[in-house]
């Protein structure tokens, strides 16, 4: 019988990533875990609908036995079974992030007994989670280099707070892994600005694009008008394609915040990325830790290791026999596996 791993949900950044990573790793390794103080670092601690959906999804996919799977719970015991491929559908029932639920269960399905399709309904454009286009255009091409083949499709947008979006991912079991080396970003090839609108006047998008174009030389400027019933909502994105990597940054518009202010937030984030020679942005760094650990080798550079990144590494090291090495050099942090 495998040992029970005890986790403190208040460690590090104290958010939902500790739980999501633990669920992924438990399904992959077969190691049970207990976690207390779930989301202790948040204003509203305990399991929200998004986190509960992730727990239920993990439970269904591997036939786990669970204690504490209810809204508001700050303690969970998870004993995994065998991961099985298949066609799965999960509904969050709020504008909680579809991609964060997918992020929880897809790594386990890389090791399933056959191909799978997972569809999640909920929020797709959430200020605190990566949108589907980030997964599709940034993360999945890097996963393919590692040997992980999955394809995400955004079927319907769902903006916060209404939700109603749908995202689906098809995934195949991994045949073999390759090592990912992302030490250098390389020269910038092109930059693309994009605005999504649903039930919001077009002049908002035009002002946001103008703000981006005032700071960067954009090779493409795209405005996409979505059906009104998918809103109201507005997302501004800027994609930076470099020789070795494509990064994508986004900001979700808010009521009573001007188009210029929304776009200026994105400009500042992209400028921070470009000010460092690091290959990987802060949010992508979080996404690369688990697949790199499963490979057991590889490296990437990031400008600064976030608390989120350090917390994720700490959880991964509890489940897998790997140790990460972080070395600051020439204004970047090089993250590798010893």
Swiss-Prot record:
GO MF, one annotated term: RNA-3'-phosphate cyclase activity
UniProtKB keywords: ATP-binding, Cytoplasm, Ligase, Nucleotide-binding
Annotated positions binding ATP: 103, 283-287
Gene Ontology cellular component list: cytoplasm
Compartment(s): Cytoplasm
EC number(s) given by UniProt: 6.5.1.4
Annotated GO biological process: RNA processing
Active site per UniProt: 308 (tele-amp-histidine intermediate)
Catalysed reaction equations from the record: a 3'-end 3'-phospho-ribonucleotide-RNA + ATP = a 3'-end 2',3'-cyclophospho-ribonucleotide-RNA + AMP + diphosphate
Pfam families: RTC (PF01137), RTC_insert (PF05189)
Main location per the UniProt record: cytoplasm
Purpose: Catalyzes the conversion of 3'-phosphate to a 2',3'-cyclic phosphodiester at the end of RNA. The mechanism of action of the enzyme occurs in 3 steps: (A) adenylation of the enzyme by ATP; (B) transfer of adenylate to an RNA-N3'P to produce RNA-N3'PP5'A; (C) and attack of the adjacent 2'-hydroxyl on the 3'-phosphorus in the diester linkage to produce the cyclic end product. The biological role of this enzyme is unknown but it is likely to function in some aspects of cellular RNA processing.
Family: Belongs to the RNA 3'-terminal cyclase family. Type 1 subfamily.
Alphabetized PANTHER family for the sequence: RNA 3' TERMINAL PHOSPHATE CYCLASE (PTHR11096), RNA 3'-TERMINAL PHOSPHATE CYCLASE (PTHR11096:SF0)
Protein name: RNA 3'-terminal phosphate cyclase
Source organism of the structure: Escherichia fergusonii (strain ATCC 35469 / DSM 13698 / CCUG 18766 / IAM 14443 / JCM 21226 / LMG 7866 / NBRC 102419 / NCTC 12128 / CDC 0568-73)
